[in-house]
């Protein structure tokens, strides 16, 4: 039935809005949530991404609406590379990722108007070329690393550093579209 309950995007990410638009979904409202994103002791990157997405969906004040939330974690082994705090940390992250494969895990959660929450974690493996100090410096100077897990955005200039991807490109950007659409439709969301 067209015109089901409204959809609220619990994220400030412009990339997530752009990705949703690619599949014809425009949220009725954007309402980012503020939760503690600290990793718990012994929590795997996958568990962290799922928990944060679920907590964001639960924390959104949107009674009677569908709520979509997501969180992306970049992991090198069991080490999380969060959003870089500054240029030095962004450069350090790129040095760590240089010439290596890492994982991007995006947790997606949808809360139905009934309060039921369903979620899924989507993992993609990304391999970067060996970066020169000049490439790292130029990328960091561009500012494109700001606000991005792992200190880079594959949809920008850093896409030129990636030699291989195994998994969902849209999960790396921040919202796996197939899984997101499936979760929404499974709970009865219709546009």
Curated annotation (Swiss-Prot):
Biological process per Gene Ontology, one example term: nucleotide metabolic process
Catalytic residues identified in the record: 71 (proton acceptor)
Enzyme Commission number: 3.6.1.9
Keyword Cytoplasm part of the UniProt annotation: yes
Compartments reported by the entry: Cytoplasm
Transferase found in the keyword field: no
Catalytically driven reaction(s): dTTP + H2O = dTMP + diphosphate + H(+); UTP + H2O = UMP + diphosphate + H(+)
CC per GO annotation: cytoplasm
Pfam families tied to this protein: Maf
Record key words, sorted: Cytoplasm, Hydrolase, Nucleotide metabolism
GO molecular function list: dTTP diphosphatase activity; UTP diphosphatase activity
Site feature Important for substrate specificity, where: 15, 72, 155
Required cofactor(s): a divalent metal cation
InterPro entries membership: ITPase-like_fam, Maf-like
Similarity-based family: Belongs to the Maf family. YhdE subfamily.
Function: Nucleoside triphosphate pyrophosphatase that hydrolyzes dTTP and UTP. May have a dual role in cell division arrest and in preventing the incorporation of modified nucleotides into cellular nucleic acids.
HAMAP family: Maf (MF_00528)
Protein name in the entry: dTTP/UTP pyrophosphatase
């Amino acid at each position: 039935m067209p015109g089901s309950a409204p959809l609220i995007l619990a994220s400030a990410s412009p990339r997530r809005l752009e990705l949703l638009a690619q599949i014809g979904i425009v949220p009725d409202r954007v309402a980012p949530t503020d939760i503690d994103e600290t990793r718990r002791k012994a929590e795997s990157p996958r568990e962290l991404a799922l928990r944060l997405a679920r907590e964001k969906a639960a924390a959104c004040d949107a009674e009677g609406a569908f709520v979509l939330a997501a969180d992306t974690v970049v992991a090198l082994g069991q080490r999380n590379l969060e959003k870089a705090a500054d240029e030095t940390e962004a450069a350090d992250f790129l040095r760590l990722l240089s010439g290596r494969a890492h994982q991007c895990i995006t947790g997606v959660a949808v809360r139905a108007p009934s309060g039921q929450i369903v979620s899924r974690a989507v993992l993609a493996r990304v391999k970067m070329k060996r970066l020169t100090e000049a490439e790292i410096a130029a990328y960091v100077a561009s500012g494109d690393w700001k606000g991005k897990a792992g200190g880079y955005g594959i949809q920008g200039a850093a896409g030129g550093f990636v030699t291989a991807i195994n998994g969902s490109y849209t999960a790396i950007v921040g919202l796996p579209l197939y899984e997101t659409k499936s979760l929404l439709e499974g709970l009865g969301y219709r546009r």
